[in-house]
Amino acid sequence: MSEKIRMLPAVEARALDGTEYRLPSDLGGERNLIAVAFERNHQDDVDTWLGDFAALEDEHTGLMTYEMPTISRRFSPVRGVLDGKMADAIPDPKTRARTITAYTDVGRIRDSLGLPDTKQIAVIVCDRDGVVSWLALGERSDEAAADLRAALNG
């Protein structure tokens, strides 16, 4: 029996700088390294990966890095307020441009990525078709970072 292919499904999203995206096709890299967060308290776990994200993007031509807060579509009416608060907390324009919020069916994202739940962040590498070639859950560990580096080098 073959393993289920993990996918980043098609979703409308917007970066904190206002750029509209149709994911995954509008992602900027041949390969895209994305920290997918599901809860506000996940930002600390995302932050543990950001040093690796910056270094790997410098080392790998065609790799782009993103943060993707994934929020239930029921919060769409207050998107401006929520995105505004996130943008205010991020002084760096490059980081705002790479933080893409998706107000969507969170369960659909979870299921397409093959996640058991949304209690942890998912760090993924995917192409512009959404095919996930690497995935780790939770905060950075040395083992997960080494595995990511090997996947990108392989």
Task: Name each model-derived stretch.
Residues 39, 71, 137-141:
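Short beta->alpha junction loops/turns
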Residues 8, 28-31, 62, 120:
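A structure-centric signal for secondary-structure junctions around beta-strands
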Residues 66-68, 81-117:
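Short, internal strand/loop/helix patches
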Residues 42-91:
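Structural microenvironment flanking redox-active thiols in thiol-disulfide oxidoreductases
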Residues 1-24, 48, 96-98:
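N-terminal "domain-start" segment that seeds a small globular fold
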Residues 25-47:
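Short active-site neighborhood of thiol/selenol oxidoreductases, capturing the structured segment around
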